[in-house]
């Protein structure tokens, strides 16, 4: 499986793509191609064009969660002409209104708009995209140091309630050397995600983890996360997006952290 980073907070020197505080990945397997998250704007589409990637070839568009740094680019994506009607796979809560301090932070496009271009598959359950690649669905909180926490509110069944971001999910690829896990923001907790991916696939060895860890301070939660990741003995860690420099530096003191940016290509067999 090959993965190309279409959007991240960071760009590389002498590699002239656009960056923004957002995430988008292009994934190719032997059988199919997938778009995982759509950044904050149309910048991921401009980067894809510069990389020679035609996103209209996607078998499915996958969402990690609702927040607009992952869904903001859906509006320009809808303006494209797809050769066939791709699937759109997301948690049912991902397309609900999400608010933070009076500001809408959810998807800028509705379920009805998306259904015009995509075959919507809204589910809490895991979806096997290929024999080796799975969209994990709703992540259970099983680790005491990674409890659910609220960010703003979500409007559901006609009422606003605290948003515990239950729509947050990730991908797992079953490779020859173990699992490779790809996250958006890891609001569910990167360690909860790893634990669930292992349980779901039956694979104990983690080969790599890529994505946002949603850790900004080297606090008790971050320290417990670092201890967990060290215990897992993961050869390749690619924390990016919503992982601060301080946390990445602390993690690098204990684990093999590798740098990624817009345009980085990774491959797992």
Tell where the protein language model's regions lie, with residue ranges.
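Conserved beta-strand hairpin/beta-sheet module of binuclear metal-dependent hydrolase folds
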Residues: 2-51, 164-183
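General small-molecule cofactor/ligand-binding pocket signal
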Residues: 4, 89, 119-124, 134-136, ...
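Active-site metal-binding loops of divalent metal-dependent hydrolases
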Residues: 8-10, 38-41, 66, 92-94, ...
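Pre-active-site segment of Zn-dependent metallo-hydrolases
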Residues: 17, 32-60, 75-76, 147, ...
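Active-site metal-binding motif and surrounding structural segment of the metallo-beta-lactamase
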Residues: 43-91, 201-208
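Cap/insert and terminal regions of metallo-dependent hydrolase folds
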Residues: 67-71, 76, 164-170, 174-261
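Active-site neighborhood of divalent metal-dependent phosphoester bond hydrolases
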Residues: 93-116
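Active-site-proximal loop/helix segment associated with metal-binding centers of metalloenzymes
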Residues: 102-104, 125-176
